[in-house]
UniProtKB/Swiss-Prot annotation:
Residues 24-229 are lumenal. Glycans are attached at N103, N107, N139. One of its GO terms (biological process) is 'de novo' protein folding. Required for normal levels of the cell wall 1,6-beta-glucan. Involved in a protein folding machinery chaperoning proteins acting in various physiological processes including cell wall synthesis and lysis of autophagic bodies. It comes from Yarrowia lipolytica (strain CLIB 122 / E 150) (Yeast). GO terms for molecular function: unfolded protein binding. Belongs to the ROT1 family. This is Protein ROT1. Residues 248 are cytoplasmic.
């Protein structure tokens, strides 16, 4: 077999691999998992919101995270900090938690329907609030015109692009966990209007056990595949093969 034939074969295989990873998809199977913006500091689950004590836990850096299951549940965690142009010493910060169900329509629209009683928001505006931030319920249905999942050619990681209903892109997110790192997909803090169970203490105990179990079983941090390194490994193998062919 000639060197040119070997090189062509290996190059074709590498191009096929990279080309496949760069093709995008918008299926439920590809959407599954926990996605986080570039900093990776914001992740859905018990490290962002404690449903037992109803606490929003501030991450080290701002960011967004969305999680999806194959059977139609979602969770979102948002931490945003906005500068105050009039007074740089007074930035505002907001923490938002929601979870519920989602639906993908035939035209690719992604709709998130949160559980009305479970959403929480913590708003901090130090120049308007002398001491404490404002903690309140939060309920906002979200619609995305479309979404796309593919391997980012630069970072070599699975990437999720969400496009708002007006077509504007959200910050890109990267796969952090699959299956998703999420709180239980049931109503966490039911009210009387939401058909509250008779034994609330028992319900909270079940939620706590579920959270503890999710921390130790079935959830794995997604490893990063460096496709640039894979490409250069292939090139080096071609070069080594060429050298070996030359000295035969």
């Amino acid at each position: 077999m000639k060197l040119s034939t070997i090189s062509a074969f290996v190059t074709s295989a590498l191009l096929a691999t990279v080309g496949h990873t760069q093709s995008d998809s918008s299926s439920v199977d590809d959407l599954e998992g926990t996605w986080s913006s570039k900093s990776g500091a914001v992740i859905t689950g018990p490290d962002f919101y404690d449903p037992i004590d109803e606490l929003l836990l501030e991450p080290t850096l701002p960011g967004i995270s969305y999680s999806f299951t194959k059977d139609g549940f979602f969770e979102e965690a948002i931490y945003q900090v906005s500068a105050n142009p009039k007074d740089p010493k007074c930035p505002t910060g907001v923490l938002i938690f929601q979870h519920g169900t989602y639906n993908i329509s035939d035209n690719g629209t992604l709709t998130l329907e949160p559980y009305m009683v479970d959403g929480r928001q913590l708003l901090s505006d130090p120049c308007k609030q002398e001491e404490n931030a404002v903690y309140s319920r939060y309920n906002q249905t979200e619609k995305f015109k479309r979404f796309s999942v593919y391997v980012d050619p630069y970072h070599g990681r699975y990437r999720l692009d969400l496009f708002q209903f007006n077509g504007a892109p959200m910050p890109p997110m990267y796969l952090a966990y699959r299956p998703a790192m999420m709180l239980p997909t049931v109503t966490l803090n039911p009210t009387q209007e939401a058909s509250q169970p008779e034994n609330t203490g028992s319900t909270r105990a079940k939620i706590r056990r579920s959270i503890d179990n999710r921390k130790v079983t079935g959830i794995k941090k997604h490893s990063v595949v460096d496709y640039n390194s894979l490409w250069w490994f292939g090139v080096s193998m071609i070069a080594a093969g060429g050298a070996g062919w030359y000295f035969l």
